[in-house]
């Protein structure tokens, strides 16, 4: 994931909702801590906030939630995010954008 996120994906860590940013869908939503760690390493989330994981007062839930600006779709059930990722990729083609969509499943 580190190689994909830091060597392959195109995004602005200070503007994760940039329309040309690549998309990453964590279809296995229970792997959200990995997503949070990647964004912390990129500088978007303060590393100290990673200890807030799964606290009631925290946005860093056990599964990704679109309340976070770097999450496009809430996921949970295995495979659920694949449909969202396919839709995102088809949308890129439809609007003639060159953003890429990646999906972590299984």
Placement of each model-derived feature along the sequence:
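Cofactor-binding active-site loop characterized by glycine-rich and histidine/acidic residues
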Residues: 1-106
